[in-house]
Amino acid sequence: MFVLETEEDFGRVAAQTAKQVIMQGIREAERERVLSEYGDKEGTVVNGTIQKIDRGNVIIEFGRATGMLSKKEQIPGEFYKQGARIKAYLYSVEEGARGINLWLSRTHPQFLLELFAIEAPEVANEVVELKAIAREPGARSKVAVWSNDEGIDPIGSLVGQRGVRAIAFSSTTS
């Protein structure tokens, strides 16, 4: 680093170089912030807003970061509208040439597990365990459950009173 003596030392080229160095530093800091923020969220369900739909791929915005829900990770027959809120499973955070890539899925088997942990506190507290999940995305899902507490009905805790939890869960996945 050097110190400029007078204002005459500030030429057009020097000003542009300084601007580029500052902008590069800002971009690097932004990349690091996004990587640290979303690297911790890898393997969880995230909420976002649909920004645009490009050739079947859905671009989802999460504040200062965007993620990609590719066509193969979408539930068949599901339609997406720009501006709609959506939940998706963040299965990969990668550093690419053009920034941080967030890869999302709505068909991943872990998506169901994470949704159950959100909807049913018994699953989050590990009182009820999900032993196995079989899923045909968009059609049906089967879940084998087990209770670690004899006083808690594992099926009832996931279905909820009058099916309230099952309805909320079903509306999220289809």
What role is predicted for each listed range?
Residues M1-S174:
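RNA-contacting regions in translation and RNA-metabolism proteins
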